[in-house]
Amino acid sequence: MLRCQHNAWIHLGLTIVAIGAGFFFGLSSREWCWIILAIAIVWTAEALNTAFEFLADAASPEFHPLVRDAKDVAAGAVLITAIAATIIAAIVFWPHVAELLKWSNGVLE
């Protein structure tokens, strides 16, 4: 996937950031479960999207509007999972970030 999908590199970078932040903030087991689930869902969607694109290209090497539309729908599924993962990350990390800000400079006191 990383060889052919530009967005996979973005997902990889954000995966590394999420895992690093998890270690930095000392997430609980329950929080880790949510983060790992979110990461796994995004990577699964990206893998399925990539496989679908390969199959569509093999079935119809020339341009066809229905193939384009099908690829757009598959890419949209990845976007939906990425948005859901972002929401999960915000819910998990916000209390930790808020506590860090409160502790470091009194912003949230």
Mark where each language-model region is.
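Histidine-centered, metal-coordinating catalytic motifs and their short helical/loop contexts
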Residues: V67
